[in-house]
Swiss-Prot record:
PANTHER family for this protein: CATALASE (PTHR11465:SF9)
Protein name: Catalase easC
Keyword Heme in record: yes
EC number: 1.11.-.-
Organism: Claviceps purpurea (Ergot fungus)
Amino acid sequence: MASEVSVASSGSEHSGAQKCPFQDPGLSSMDQDSRLRDILSRFNREKIPERAVHARGAGAYGEFEVTHDVSDICDIDMLLGVGKKTPCVVRFSTTTLERGSAESVRDVKGMAIKHFTQDGNWDWVCLNIPMFFIRDPSKFPDMVHAQRPDPTTNVANPSRWWEFVCNNHETLHMVMFQFSDFGTMFDYRSMSGYAAHAYKWVMPDGSWKYVHWFLASDQGPNFETGHQAKQIGADDAESATRDLYQSLERGEYPSWTVKVQVVDPEDAPKLPFNILDVTKHWNLGNYPPDIDVIPGRTLGKLTLKKEPQDYFEEIEQLAFSPSRLVHGVEASEDPMLQARLFAYPDAQKHRLGPNNLDLPANRTKKFADGARPEKAEMAPQKVPSQEHADWVSQVKSSSWSEPNETDYKFPREFWKALPRLRGEAFQNSLVVNMAKSVSQVPVDMREKVYSTLALIADDLADRVRTMTEEIVE
């Protein structure tokens, strides 16, 4: 039998047939071979806990380049100076399912960017849909569990998700996106990313603006129907990762145009919805037609150019958090954002250990090119009006978790706008996708779903009911 060579953690080579030599027949190899124990113990411990959410992912390196002057609205070094380039790493992901799940499943997709700026690391933690399911962070664990397999059988159970939706109507806007073909984006390159939350950009004089940034894919959207996505998943569970890496190897570097929406704090209370409510999007002019348009202002371009050489060390050990901000950026009062400021670093301490920021993937590169001049102290933030203070207090009121009319208005206007924005087939696909899911739940739950959808639009509820009952029969 040919001799094989194993390498212990010390780096020393160890020869022996099947790597299990015996020096004394009276003693076990475990007693004889400390290197074997080393090899086995390393194998037993080589995997780290997977992420609680966004477990399945892929990543690549690139750079962000400033293409437009935005010095009038920000004092962020990375964004000051047309032509300035900042290295970054991007991780794409699915959200609720496990690390080994197919990338084509109906799921919200994540796009997290770590910018290695001269002021430290600045993380953008984005989704491919510009809103979220809930605005009350205490509901987050139940929301995630409702989308996971049934703990009794470990089999998917749509009743759990529809029960959550019917009891939490603020989810309806996001649910409409999830069950449209937005929920089955085919590849990461064609996916846009949205911060979803409001942040604050603070100027040296203490003045500030609410902002929401997003990345629009220059490759354009690439949707698949539910049937196509299911077939892709069966044929290639890693389809999106493979597409990303193959494009980089061909020299086809995907890019995204980065834009920001800006709201003055004195104007925020005048808007017909609360921009601190992450279940709503900042209207770019698509819908609702009677809500103020908040235009996007171009900042720059993000381009991916290089795939990782060691996925575990370079991508799996990445630790992103919306709390990783730089000079000139602050978190808003959005309760979901405030909860994430704690939850992300806490999860990373569990997954990667307390010193996870010292790992090469997460280490800052600031001052790498020499000492950097100290930034001038910023003036205290200017205090907005009492009207603004009263508006902010809404997020702390008991009514924040309760349904309100905008929870139905936004999904209703999305439903009505779909034929104009994407075509009749896109709207019909939403009905088909919902019906396939609802047809798997008991009759009493189906009736509850129809009643909930009727709060959005009667024709939506009627069409889902008709198709669902046809499937059931």
